Regions:
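A charged, amphipathic alpha-helical module
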Residues: 10-11, 20-27, 34-133, 259, ...
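An N-terminal, globular interaction/scaffold subdomain
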Residues: 99-204, 225
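Redox- and metal-dependent alpha/beta enzyme cores, enriched for Fe-S-associated oxidoreductases
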Residues: 129, 138-177, 363-432, 436-440, ...
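Gly/Ser/Thr-rich loops at beta-strand to alpha-helix junctions
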Residues: 134-143, 215-223, 365-372, 458-465
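Active-site and donor-binding regions of nucleotide-sugar-utilizing enzymes
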Residues: 161-249, 255-257, 483-485
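Extended, charge-rich low-complexity interaction segments
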Residues: 187-205, 267-288, 415-437, 510-529
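Hydrophobic alpha/beta core scaffold segments
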Residues: 375-389, 404-424, 432-522
Length: 529
């Protein structure tokens, strides 16, 4: 079997060295982590910053009404607790990288909540603002908005379901139960089912002049989209466009069709919103997308060394926000990227590590559980297994045409279609055997990994059919393959501890190893947010 060289942390770690003792079976931990004076003060300053963002949301137009009207708003009281889980065991540069990235992710979600409540007919009821908004799926690359600086894309499903489930593990269960009472089967993807449930029980904000829905991440989303679109069009008078991305996106023949559909979508938005597409704005956005891709690959090159710096759940969430929610439209992201890049280079130079030792180098493949996304940092601190990158962060590698010339416009439509087809997760789970299986082993080689952790989402049919192929090819290559089951956003099927137990069992029985921090192996966080 392939083995990785064990890397030892030569720096003396200040503060707490055992982290499981911080959990006491309550909603939050019994105290926050002590990191030494300097890092604790820095960490506390970011804690205060998070509260300032949440207070600003509450005080914004419609904020107080939103807290009372929508059940999902209460989940955001747990934001500081969630960020604490992402920074477990971190010191120096790794702590600052994580906070820099998550500060902006939280700020971006907070802006989404502010805009959503401001335009919502039930809370802020700002009609003028609402008429400048286009509703978009949370799972869409918002490329069709890259040339519309006059109007806003509102991803209302992000605060309602996606990010809420990261904050509190039981945030989606009510919506799942509502959907199943309505007659939707319980063995479908819980993400789309929860979105349908939120629509059924009127827990989505209502705003916007029109809406664009997509069939990404998978065709399972069509189930929820049908219910949501019906309510938007028939009850709220919000027309909806269906932007269909071909499933076999690796086939070059489908690009022309996808580009034509993108043209129709843009023309439809122009018609409904009364605005014109601006090519100058589009090419500014695509330059930022290209810069994001270059920066991401430089971070991954550092992760290919013995001293990776930017990895784990925050790496994934930052890429989600940067590519999908933003897609080059925000001018604020490049300076954040630059700041992270400086910290990554500095951390690599200083050989900064998160744990006392790194025993294994792991690629994380498949779709992670929203309610246990912090498991990647648990792996580092409990078992010394470094999650170098995850499937959802492997979005695109190519760069797109940046030159604003009329002869490049047709290519630009194809570039937008390519981005839409290759949105996060979908670019691997759909498109054929090559992009899901073969590319995994390419990343294993490029990042010098000796282990793969395969998330097995029970309700997802895309990966489950290739279970045997992954097993066989991992065996041929001498790669340790760990299967970990979950149900995406329903912790009642697989609890957090059940998820951790699967990984721990492999490390003990197959790898014959003992944990770095035994207090983390069994954590009483069943009731924790």
């Amino acid at each position: 079997m392939k083995t990785a060289e064990i890397v030892y942390n030569t720096k003396k770690k200040k503060g707490d060295k055992q982290y499981g003792v911080l959990f006491n079976n309550g909603k939050v931990r019994k105290r926050r982590e002590w990191r030494g004076v300097k890092d604790t003060l820095y960490d506390f300053s970011r804690w205060l910053y998070l509260w300032s963002i949440m207070i600003s949301v509450t005080l914004s137009r419609g904020g107080m009404k939103g807290m009372i009207r929508y059940r999902w708003m209460a989940n955001y009281l747990a934001v500081p607790h969630a960020i604490d889980k992402f920074t477990i065991g971190m010191r120096d540069e790794t702590l600052r990288i994580t906070h820099t990235a998550m500060d902006f992710v939280v700020k971006d979600v907070a802006l989404c909540i502010k805009d959503t409540l401001r335009g919502d007919r039930r809370t802020g009821n700002d009609v003028e603002f609402s008429n400048k908004c286009v509703l978009s799926d949370e799972n869409a690359m918002t490329v069709f908005m890259m040339g519309f600086p006059q109007i806003k894309a509102i991803l209302r499903e992000i605060p309602t379901m996606f990010s809420a489930n990261i904050m509190t593990q039981y945030s989606s269960t009510y919506y799942l139960d509502i959907a199943q009472q309505f007659g939707i089967p319980g063995d479908v993807c819980p993400m789309h089912e929860a979105e349908a449930g939120a629509s059924i029980c009127d827990d989505f904000a209502v705003l916007g002049k029109c809406a664009v829905q997509v069939n990404t991440t998978c065709d399972g989303s069509l189930m929820g989209n049908g219910i949501i679109a019906k309510r938007l069009e028939r009850e709220y008078g919000i027309p909806t466009f269906q932007l269909a991305a071909p499933m076999r996106h690796e086939n070059p023949d489908v690009l022309d069709y996808a580009a034509e559909d993108m043209k129709k979508c843009i023309a439809w938005v122009e018609e409904k919103m009364g605005v014109k597409w601006d090519w100058d704005t589009y090419f500014e956005c695509i330059k930022r997308v290209n810069q994001t891709t270059r920066d991401r690959w430089e971070w991954l090159e550092v992760n290919a060394t013995q001293y990776p710096q930017f990895f784990g759940a925050v790496f994934s969430l930052y890429n989600d926000t940067n590519y999908m929610g933003n897609c080059g439209r925000s001018k604020d992201f490049p300076p954040i990227n630059d700041k992270i890049m400086k910290l990554v280079r500095q951390g690599y130079k200083n050989k900064t590590m998160m744990a006392p030792e790194y025993r294994h180098r792991c690629i994380v493949w498949g779709v992670q559980p929203q309610y246990c996304i912090d498991q990647l940092y648990w792996m580092v601190n409990c078992w010394g297994v470094v999650p170098l990158t995850d499937m959802l962060s492997m979005v695109v590698e190519k760069e797109f045409c940046e030159e604003n010339k009329p002869e490049n416009y047709e290519q630009a439509y194809k570039d937008m279609a390519y981005l839409n087809m290759n949105m996060i997760m979908r670019n691997k789970t759909h498109g054929g055997y090559e992009c899901l299986v073969d590319e995994l082993w390419e990343y294993v080689e490029r990042l010098n990994a000796d282990m793969v952790m395969m998330w097995e989402h029970m309700s997802c049919k895309a990966l489950n059919g290739l279970h045997g192929q992954f097993e066989e090819q991992a065996r041929e290559r001498g790669i340790h393959l760990v299967w970990v089951c979950h149900d995406l956003c329903d912790p009642r099927v697989f609890t957090r501890q059940a998820i951790r137990d699967q990984f721990s069992e492999y490390m003990r029985t197959v790898m014959r190893e003992e944990p770095l921090d035994p207090t983390l192996e069994f954590m009483p966080d069943e009731n924790a947010w």
